Amino acid sequence: MQLFHLCLIISCTCPTVQASKLCLGWLWGMDIDPYKEFGATVELLSFLPSDFFPSVRDLLDTASALYREALESPEHCSPHHTALRQAILCWGELMTLATWVGNNLQDPASRDLVVNYVNTNMGLKIRQLLWFHISCLTFGRETVLEYLVSFGVWIRTPPAYRPPNAPILSTLPETTVVRRRDRGRSPRRRTPSPRRRRSQSPRRRRSQSRESQC
């Protein structure tokens, strides 16, 4: 299996640091988390079950439909675009390697073992990467991080003490916008309240009565 990882590094010729982090972490077991620079962690994404993530094909179709022009552009759009490019390229190289291994292994059991390992273990990592960066581009990084935290709290809460349904990512932007608006408002104490205005009226009446007496 170590030889398989070595073949992966040789075939994964992505020139950027993001791809190097991904490949080197798989090979030598280095403590490299590809999500840390984006404010998340592998552990945070692990709260989401494996069947939560769409298939690689569906994620690739989504990325192509929404961000094809930006992904194919030579310009640097954002760190998420760069990471998404490298994840797509690594998956393509990985599929090429898996096909080559499958065609050249004579033992059917070994061939199935390699294919299943790629589809389950590495396939899940690619699905997580694709989902994370596509979601950050679609909904915003802060919204995705808030969703991961909310889902982690929900899944770790005993069923008797949590809502029946898990948080939904598409509904979080509405609450996030409201919170940002609340933060941007000026403090209400700067403007006089109706109670203060009412409290001033008796004083004015007293002053007017004193002037009339004089």
UniProtKB/Swiss-Prot annotation:
Protein family membership: Belongs to the orthohepadnavirus precore antigen family.
Entry GO MF terms: DNA binding; RNA binding; structural molecule activity
InterPro entries: Hepatitis_B_virus_capsid_N (IPR013195), Hepatitis_core (IPR002006), Viral_capsid_core_dom_sf_HBV (IPR036459)
Keyword hit for Phosphoprotein: no
Site (Cleavage): 185-186
Residues covered by region (Disordered): 165-214
Location in the cell: Secreted; Host nucleus
Gene3D superfamilies per the UniProt record, alphabetical: Viral capsid, core domain supefamily, Hepatitis B virus
Native source species: Hepatitis B virus genotype A2 subtype adw (isolate Japan/Nishioka/1983)
Biased composition (Basic residues): 178-207
Quaternary state and interactors: Homodimerizes.
Protein's UniProt name: External core antigen
